[in-house]
Amino acid sequence: EDAMFILWKDHSASAEAEEITEKARCFTGGNYLEYSGGLYSAEWYWAKLLHLCRTNPKLAEAAESLVEHCDWITGLLCGDTGPARIARSRCAAGHKALWNTAFGGYPPKEFFKTLDPRLSRFRTGLPGETVTSDKAAGRLCPEWASRLGLPAGIVVGVGLFDAHAAALGAGIRRGTAVKVIGTSSSEMIVVAPEDLRGRAVSGIESQAEGSMIPGLLSLEAGQSAFGDIFAWFRGLLAFPLEGLLSRGLISDGTLDESIEAIIPALSEAASRRSPRDTGPVALDWFNGRRAPFANHRVKAGVSGLGLDTDAPEFFRALVYAAAFGTRAIHEHLRGEGVAVEKVVAVGGIPRKAPFVMQTLADVLNVEVEAPEISHASARGAALLAAVAGGLYPDTETALARFARAAGLEAAGRGYRPFKEARPVIETLYQKYLDLGRFIDYS
């Protein structure tokens, strides 16, 4: 049986995403993938809904609508989760559900009928308008006011995705790529419409109007796995330890401490060594590829292993893979005419993995700023709530105020690239690209 929620990370809808892409390319009524990088993703709204229709038709028949979690939460807080009345956020609809003013909203029912007639019913039930996250969705209902210990009737802002909120919490501005790094990673960028001269950026995840800052276009591209890659490797190395626990040879506490020590130990050992251009090379596609040009069926690969490859060197190859994936995205963006002049990193990884961050700076060949922000998404949500509640006239004013209050201009650590590593990194990056082409076309 299906649960109440569908996780974005689940790629069960890969076939449906590919079908949406093919149907959209053949549809004569308009190019509805124009603002989604030219490809639809298995992580997004319509692919998951189409997959649900085909795998659980009974539930699909009973369902009134599919609601993004960030929209459902605001409805819950306001005391009304009726799908027709929930404020649908520009962020969710614009980045994941094909909503755009150029289309007059969502694609028409005729488009969805080419995929499955049941989708047209869900399309009919969606409101025509979406709301930017600097606006009020409603007011806090008595039930949740009591649960949260807050006054009933205070403003509840329209929701948005965590990475977009984190980018605002990090003080995003034009020319800056905010890299939100955790289990996965997202590159968040804002540009003025005139910067693109009416063009859509191909090969990224999506671009949406005003999903972070009203009046600016928000671009999103990222990696489906980042921290998850290192967690996977840690799990491989921890397997014998878990066997010792089952045989009573090690305690729970000792096991937990030992597992927690694996990544720091690997990082320390790898940081003491100079990289070699004959070492192993890995891909970061452990959970498919988001960008450039999404493909959630591809898998990671590794080449160049030898009997002299030890755990720290293998770990370094995985760290390079994650960094190379970021570089490929940034190079693609620049090739599309998008300025990336500065990189700011927030999330769990920047705060606890200096070796990973230094490698990222070396690979990107730019300084990577890591401000001291422990809860960037919460900070961004608070910023928008302050605008929705009338404390600031607009998002950009709130951004400037929050940046000054938090000292974002000076706080945190900057990772500068080591120039000595450039020749080896360039060789390894070309091998990364070659391995990627081989896996892509295999």
Language-model region placement:
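Short beta-strand scaffold segments in enzyme catalytic cores
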Residues: G75, K96-A97, A165-G169, S185-I189, ...
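Gly/Ser/Thr-rich active-site cleft segment
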Residues: F27-V158, L283-N287, F315, V319
